[in-house]
């Protein structure tokens, strides 16, 4: 059995100033206090709901792999307000197992970061980016941990891929980022 639980990240992206920022990052604590740790789902839900009150959220993509029941509730509450949608039937769903789409979104983020077009804020989010390793596959490059049981988290970087993907879809849909501060979130 794996001894390290993945983190959960809720990452915002400002279309106005092109900045990625952590809204919430939940990681398994080290040592005995990390034994039996689980992501605090109620806390994550509260942060998502607070983000919709605080920001003008135009897109919110989340990998439903472990969150499908919660995402269905978020879709019922917020799906109609989103300008960009993961799919027609599930506006928040964005499966991370769709390799070719993940590769394209990863390349998009990598290009923007390497060209200085996106600012990454928060020490924990920066650490997640530094922990991410390039993994080449048949479809292209994705990110991964250094090894599967690595305690070094990359979930914030993975969440950032979806935040930027939602942002690029918003721009393509004509969301005007100059009038108001427009932010997107991903969990």
Label each residue range with its predicted role.
Residues 1-99, 103, 107, 111, ...:
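RNase H-like, metal-dependent nuclease domains and their acidic two-metal-ion catalytic environment used
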């Amino acid at each position: 059995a794996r001894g390290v639980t993945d983190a959960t990240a809720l990452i915002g992206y400002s279309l106005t100033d092109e900045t990625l920022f952590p809204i919430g990052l939940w990681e398994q604590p080290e040592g005995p206090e990390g034994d039996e740790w689980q992501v605090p789902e109620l806390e994550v839900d509260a942060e998502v709901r607070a983000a919709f009150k605080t920001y003008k959220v135009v897109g919110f993509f989340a990998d439903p792999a472990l969150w499908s029941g919660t995402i269905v509730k978020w879709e019922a509450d917020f799906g109609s307000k989103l300008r960009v949608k993961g799919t027609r039937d599930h506006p928040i769903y964005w499966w991370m197992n769709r390799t070719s789409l993940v590769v394209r979104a990863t390349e998009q983020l990598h290009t923007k970061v390497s060209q200085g077009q996106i600012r990454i804020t928060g020490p924990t989010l920066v650490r997640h980016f530094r922990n991410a390793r390039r993994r080449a596959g048949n479809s292209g490059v994705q990110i991964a941990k250094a090894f599967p049981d690595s305690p070094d988290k990359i979930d914030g970087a993975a969440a950032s891929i979806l935040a930027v993907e939602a942002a690029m879809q918003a721009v393509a849909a004509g969301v005007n980022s100059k009038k108001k501060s427009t932010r997107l979130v991903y969990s």
